From Swiss-Prot:
It catalyses: 1D-myo-inositol 2-(L-cysteinylamino)-2-deoxy-alpha-D-glucopyranoside + acetyl-CoA = mycothiol + CoA + H(+). GO terms for biological process: mycothiol biosynthetic process. InterPro entries: Acyl_CoA_acyltransferase, GNAT_dom, MshD_Acetyltransferase, Mycothiol_AcTrfase. It comes from the Bacteria. Monomer. This is Mycothiol acetyltransferase. Signal peptide: none annotated. Belongs to the acetyltransferase family. MshD subfamily. Acetyl-CoA 2 binds at V231, G232, V233, N274, G275, A276, A277, V278, K279. Gene3D superfamilies: 3.40.630.30. Keywords: Acyltransferase, Repeat, Transferase. It comes from Mycobacterium sp. (strain JLS). Its EC number is 2.3.1.189.
């Protein structure tokens, strides 16, 4: 019988096994079962770790990460079970344990909201409380970039840019469960990632004051896929077309980076209920590719 136990920290071997399970699930399902932040948490002790071990196989077969509540987000769980060990009730048992540990307001992500996740949600009596759209478009036939008078575009020059980057990010995303409330450590963690490229972090400055108005952080996933990782505009600078300017600047950069691909594509994530942003991205040629759903127990 599969054993399921909480850990305050993971061994190096457990971390390696979990990364292998995530990779296997991604290949099998066509969608990553957990977000990048979960992988960053594996060596840390900021979150709780629920590990499923199959005694016959003598191996880790499932993992749930439980992030505690923050000022902007409820407790959030993310879950993966190895494809070879599914349909045994492990996923449902781990989801039940994670939500119970997280408390009344805890949620659990279903990346791609696949049928297996929907079935588990029905079994546990969960309902969708939040949806995140993944939108994509080809990196071809891009509109030209237009920069307003008084605005200067530059790329990230190093940690000296961080105070302004944090100011704009936390103003633009004060409401956001994951993107809001960033600190120096959040930027430093991403700067340490293998994918980080300072030439792909675009910043728009006000010529007169020198203040940062907005930024676009791009990410390259592989030879065929790039991402609009974060676009943030200072609320005080809204209405100047900066969102479109920064987005298109990043798209042209990604198109150049992926120029050897026969089908270069860019993706982004946006809240399903952010109608204005969804409309903007549709105007830029993006269409919905998949939907991530956050589930929770909802009182009658």
């Amino acid at each position: 019988m599969t054993s399921i136990d909480w850990r305050s920290a993971l061994t190096d071997d457990e971390q390696g096994s979990i990364r292998d399970i995530v990779a296997a699930a991604t290949r099998h399902d066509g969608v990553a079962p957990v977000g990048d932040q979960v992988l960053r948490e594996l060596p840390a002790d900021r979150t709780r770790h629920l590990v499923a071990v199959d005694p016959d196989a003598g191996a880790v077969v499932g993992y749930l990460n439980l992030a505690p509540a923050s000022d902007t987000a409820p407790p959030m769980a993310e879950l993966v079970v190895h494809p070879d060990f599914r349909r045994r009730g492990t996923g449902a048992a781990m989801a039940r344990a994670g939500l119970a540990e997280g408390g009344t307001h805890a949620r659990i992500w279903a990346h791609g909201n696949l049928e297996a996740a929907r079935a588990t949600a029905r079994t546990l009596g969960l309902q969708v409380v939040r949806e995140l759209l993944q939108m994509r478009r080809p990196l071809t036939d891009l509109p030209p970039v237009t920069v307003a008078d008084g605005v200067r575009l530059a790329t990230y020059s190093g940690p000296g840019d961080d105070p302004e980057l944090l100011r704009v990010n936390n103003s633009a995303f004060a409401w956001h469960p994951e993107q809001g409330g960033w600190t120096d450590a959040d930027i430093a963690e991403r700067r340490a990632e293998a994918w980080f490229d300072p030439a792909g972090l675009f910043m728009a400055f006000d010529d007169a004051s020198g203040k940062l108005l907005g930024f676009h952080w791009t990410k390259v996933h592989g030879p065929d896929l790039g991402e609009v990782y974060v676009v943030g505009v200072d609320p005080a600078a809204q209405g100047r077309g900066l969102g479109a300017t920064l987005t298109l600047t990043g798209l042209h950069h990604l198109a150049e980076r992926l120029s050897n691909s026969p089908q270069p594509t860019v993706m982004l994530y946006v809240e399903a209920d952010n109608g204005a942003a969804v409309k903007t991205y549709r105007r830029l040629g993006f269409d919905v590719s998949s939907v991530d759903a956050a589930y929770a127990a909802v009182a009658d």
